[in-house]
Each structure stands twice: as structure tokens, then as C-alpha cells.
Amino acid sequence: MAPASSRRMAWLLAVALQCTAFTQAIPARAASALVAWAFTEEGVLKLRTSRNARLEAFFQAASDGRGTRVWIDIPGELRFPRRLEGRGAVREIRLGKPRAGATRLVVEFRPDVDLNPNDLRLRGTAPDRWELVFTGLPTRGLDDFGEGD
């Protein structure tokens, strides 16, 4: 019969192996690649992400009394969804989780703001920096605001 310390070591090893197998079966939820964002008084949305993040941008024209919406999907999961009141032509900015493993930043404009989707381009300025210039956006009343640095 094995001494008590050997049995205890075997038991601890078995528990450790089971815990490892269990944690590998659970899908990992990576933190959002979005590190910081800012909407400038010039009508530019600036994003800072983890290096080489792949972003997708979308446009939805105004309808049913709601303003035009532009949103960007970013890899990784946001911890705390939130809404921020906009300024000037921006009605609101929302950060949320559209699905597991993704973060969405939505810029909703006031209903009277008219934007042409052909004038909008999300471009990378560095491996971890992005800009979306809202050409034609009225800048009166816009102030710099955002989160992070």
C-alpha cells in the first residue's frame, strides 16, 4: 500500500488534470481589442485598438425618426456596455456586445444630419490606430469627447 503522501500527490495530480481539461473546454472570452476612442470637434472618430485588430464598419441611413447610424465591430468582448449622450450633430454613442466575442461602437446622429456613406472611410493610421472622418458632418456644437487616452 502506498504511503499517505503518495496517495495525496496522486489525488492532487488527478484533480489538476481534470481542472485543466475543464478549463480548456470552456471558450475563452478575450477582452475587447478597443483600448480607447475619441470623437473630435472636427467630426473625426479616432480609435486605438490592440495591434493588428480587424475592424468592420457599417452604415444605416436615417429611418423611422432615428438618425443615421454608423457602427464598428471590434474583436473581443466588452465588459461594461454603456451609452454616452452626444454633442452637436451626434445624438449618442453606444458601446455594446452584439454577440459573444465582439464589441460594437455605434455613433447615432441626430435625425436632421445627412451623411453620404460613399464619403466615409475607416482607415488605419498605425497598427493600433484608426480614423473615421465624417465628411460633411456639421461640426457646430461638437466637442472632443471619448474614453481612454
Predicted feature residues:
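Bacterial N-terminal signal peptides
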Residues: A10-A21
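Bacterial N-terminal signal peptides that target proteins for export
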Residues: A2-L12
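Accessible peptide chain termini
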Residues: M1-A2, D149
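Signal-peptide-cleaved, periplasmic/extracellular N-terminal interaction regions immediately downstream
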Residues: F22-D149
